[in-house]
C-alpha cells in the first residue's frame, strides 16, 4: 500500500499523505470537453507509465497525512491525498473531461416543466427577498474575514474575472476491497473561487439557502440536522411511505451543463436587483457567466511550518464552460435545487405521480424518495428516461437524456436509509426514528485524524476526549457504537479555556457576532475542560449544529441491535459477541467483515417491520 507508515509522534503512528498511482490514472482517461482550453504543463492525455513519472518525492514534497489515535478493528486502509503535481493533474483533468450533451427533446420538455415549477413555487418566495450582509459576515472566521478585507473595506475594486484555484482536499478516505483488489478512491478536488467572488456571491446565496429551507421547498434538505431528519422520517411513516428509492449522481459538478445551470440562474437573476453590498452586475456575472478560468498552482515543498517561505509553482490553467465548481458558494444550494427538480420530473411527469403522494430528500447529489410500496421495475424504467443508467442495468445500451448519470439506484425501506453517510433505525418504545453514523465508516475512519500533525500529548488527549464526548450526543446507550467510542476517552488535565470575543472579528455597521452562541459553546466546552485549539472547538460546534438535542435512551439499544441484525445478517448473540470482543480488545474482524459484506437484501422488502413487536 502507498499509505506508508512514516514515524511515531507522541506514541501515536503517523502516516504520509498519498500521491496518485496507476490505479487512479483510469479516472483521468477521456477527451476534453468542447470549448475547454488546456494550458497545463502536463499533457492532457498521458499513458499510465508517464502518469507515474510525476509522482512526488516522499523526502521533499509529502506532508504528514493521518495520525492513528486508537487501534483499528477493520483491515481496510485509510488514506489522505495531498496537493502535489500528480494529484492536481488528476483533479484538473477530471474537471475538464467531456460530458455527453443532453438530448434536445428532453431539454425542451424539461425546461418548460421546470420553469412552471419555478413560477408557481419559487418566484413568490423571491418577491420580498432580503438578505443581511452583517449576518453572513459575522458567520465567517477571522481568517475568512481577513481574506475578503480589501473588498469589504473598499480598498480594492472587484474585477470582472471569473477565476478559481484548484487544490486537493486533505480528507481521510477508505480504500475498499473489490473482487480481491484494493479499490482506490478518487481524490477530493476543490475549485475554490478567488476571495472577491466569495465577497460578491456569499451573502446572497446563503440567504437563498435559508429561504428555501425555511419554506420547505420540495426536496430541499440543506441545513437539516439529525433531529430534523428523524422528524421527517416519522412523518413519512405516519403517511405510510415505507418504501425508499436512494440514488447518487455520478460526477455531478462536471455534468452540470449550461441548460441545467439555467435552473439556478432564474433565481439569481430575479434577486440581482436587490443586491446592495456590491455592483449587481458583478453578482450576475459571477453566477451567470459560462466561461471560467481554473488555475493550477502549488508550493514546491509542502512543509507545513515554513510554507510561507516556499516558492509557488504554477502548473498552468484551463478555461472551461458550463460546469459547477466544487468550492463555490452556490455548489450545495445549486446542486440540491437541480437534483430535486430532476427527481421531481421523474416522479411527476414520467410516472405521473401527484406532488403530495411522495416525499423527497435531496442534498447535493444524494437523494431519497419515500413512497407507498410499488413495482420497482416501473421506477427503474422511469429513471432510464431521464438519467444515464449504467448503474441500474449494466448490460443495457442506455442513452443520456439529461446529460447526468446515476452512480446507483437502491430500493429499501425507511430503516434502510443511509442518506449522506448516516444510518437510521426506529425505536418502537420511543415512537421515533433515530439517526446515527454509518457503523462501518465509524469503525474504519474514526481512529484516524488529520488535525494533529504537531500536537502535544496533552492536546491529543483533549482531542480524543472531545471526540468521545461529542459522539455521546448521538451514540449514547447504543452499545455497538459505545464499545468502540469508549477507546477515545482520555484523562484530561484541567486547562483554562480562552474565550473568543466579538472584538476579534472585524466589525460591521449593523451587527456583530452573536454573543449568545459564543457563551453557549464556551459553557459546553468548559464543562468538559476542552483545550481551546480550533480543531477541538470545531468538533463540539459541529455536534451542536448537526447532532440530536436528546441522545438515544436505553430502550433504543435493543431496536438498534435488531436493525443491525436484519441489515448485516448477524444474530443477536453474535452482536453481543462483537460488543464483548471490542470491549476486551480481541480480534473481531471476521464477524464484522461477514456482516458488512452481507448480500442478503430480503430485509429491504420487509415493510411490516414497524408493525411487529
Region annotations inferred by a language model:
Residues 1-613:
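Viral RNA-dependent RNA polymerase
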Amino acid at each position: 500500500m502507498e499509505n506508508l507508515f512514516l514515524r511515531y509522534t507522541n506514541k501515536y503512528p503517523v502516516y504520509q499523505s498519498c500521491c496518485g498511482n496507476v490505479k487512479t490514472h483510469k479516472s483521468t482517461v477521456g477527451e476534453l470537453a468542447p470549448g475547454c482550453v488546456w494550458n497545463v504543463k502536463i499533457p492532457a492525455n498521458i499513458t499510465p507509465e508517464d502518469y507515474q513519472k510525476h509522482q512526488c518525492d516522499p523526502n521533499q514534497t509529502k506532508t504528514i497525512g493521518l495520525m492513528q489515535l486508537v487501534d483499528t478493528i477493520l483491515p481496510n486502509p485509510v488514506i489522505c491525498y495531498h496537493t502535489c503535481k500528480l494529484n492536481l493533474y488528476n483533479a484538473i483533468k477530471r474537471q475538464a473531461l467531456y460530458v455527453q450533451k443532453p438530448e434536445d427533446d428532453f431539454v425542451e420538455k424539461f425546461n418548460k416543466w421546470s420553469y412552471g415549477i419555478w413560477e408557481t413555487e419559487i418566484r413568490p418566495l423571491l418577491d420580498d427577498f432580503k438578505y443581511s450582509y452583517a449576518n453572513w459576515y459575522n458567520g465567517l472566521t477571522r481568517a475568512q474575514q481577513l481574506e475578503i478585507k480589501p473588498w469589504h473595506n473598499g480598498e480594492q475594486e472587484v474585477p470582472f474575472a471569473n477565476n478559481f484555484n484548484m487544490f486537493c482536499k486533505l480528507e481521510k478516505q477508505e480504500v475498499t476491497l473489490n473482487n480481491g483488489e484494493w479499490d482506490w478512491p478518487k481524490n477530493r478536488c476543490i475549485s475554490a473561487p478567488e476571495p472577491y467572488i466569495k465577497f460578491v456571491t456569499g451573502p446572497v446565496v446563503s440567504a437563498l439557502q435559508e429561504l428555501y429551507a425555511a419554506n420547505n421547498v420540495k426536496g430541499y434538505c440543506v441545513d437539516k440536522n439529525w433531529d430534523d431528519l428523524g422528524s421527517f422520517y416519522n412523518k413519512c411513516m405516519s403517511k405510510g411511505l415505507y418504501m425508499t428509492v436512494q440514488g447518487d449522481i455520478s460526477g455531478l459538478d462536471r455534468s452540470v451543463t449550461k441548460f441545467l445551470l439555467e435552473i439556478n440562474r432564474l433565481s439569481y437573476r430575479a434577486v440581482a436587483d436587490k443586491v446592495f453590498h456590491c455592483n449587481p452586475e458583478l453578482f450576475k456575472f459571477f453566477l451567470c457567466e459560462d466561461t471560467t478560468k481554473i488555475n493550477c498552482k502549488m508550493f514546491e515543498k509542502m512543509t507545513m511550518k515554513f510554507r510561507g517561505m516556499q516558492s509557488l509553482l504554477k502548473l498552468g490553467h484551463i478555461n472551461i464552460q458550463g460546469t459547477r465548481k466544487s468550492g463555490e458558494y452556490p455548489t450545495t444550494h445549486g446542486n440540491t435545487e437541480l437534483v430535486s427538480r430532476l427527481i421531481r420530473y421523474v416522479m411527476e411527469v414520467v410516472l405521473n405521480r401527484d406532488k403530495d403522494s411522495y416525499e423527497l430528500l435531496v442534498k447535493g447529489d444524494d437523494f431519497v424518495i419515500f413512497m407507498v410500496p410499488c413495482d420497482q421495475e416501473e421506477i427503474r424504467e422511469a429513471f432510464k428516461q431521464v438519467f444515464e443508467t449504467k448503474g441500474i442495468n449494466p448490460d443495457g445500451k442506455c442513452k443520456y437524456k439529461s446529460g447526468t448519470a446515476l452512480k446507483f439506484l437502491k430500493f429499501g425501506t425507511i430503516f434502510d436509509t443511509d442518506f449522506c453517510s448516516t444510518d437510521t433505525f426506529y425505536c418502537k418504545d420511543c415512537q421515533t426514528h433515530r439517526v446515527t453514523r454509518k457503523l462501518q465508516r465509524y469503525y474504519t475512519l474514526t481512529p484516524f485524524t488529520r488535525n494533529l500533525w504537531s500536537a502535544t500529548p496533552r492536546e491529543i488527549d483533549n482531542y480524543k476526549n472531545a471526540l468521545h464526548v461529542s459522539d455521546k450526543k448521538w451514540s449514547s446507550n447504543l452499545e455497538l457504537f459505545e464499545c468502540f467510542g469508549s477507546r477515545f476517552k482520555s484523562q484530561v488535565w484541567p486547562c483554562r479555556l480562552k474565550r473568543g470575543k466579538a472584538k476579534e472579528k472585524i466589525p460591521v455597521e449593523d451587527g456583530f457576532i452573536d454573543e449568545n452562541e459564543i457563551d453557549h459553546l464556551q459553557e459546553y466546552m468548559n464543562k468538559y475542560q476542552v483545550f481551546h485549539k480550533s480543531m477541538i472547538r470545531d468538533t463540539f460546534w459541529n455536534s451542536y449544529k448537526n447532532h440530536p438535542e436528546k441522545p438515544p435512551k436505553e430502550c433504543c439499544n435493543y431496536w438498534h441491535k435488531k436493525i443491525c441484525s436484519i441489515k448485516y445478517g448477524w444474530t443477536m448473540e453474535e452482536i453481543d459477541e462483537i460488543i464483548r470482543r471490542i470491549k476486551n480488545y480481541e480480534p473481531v474482524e471476521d464477524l464484522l467483515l461477514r456482516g458488512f459484506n452481507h448480500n442478503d437484501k430480503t430485509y429491504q422488502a420487509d415493510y411490516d417491520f414497524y408493525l411487529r413487536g
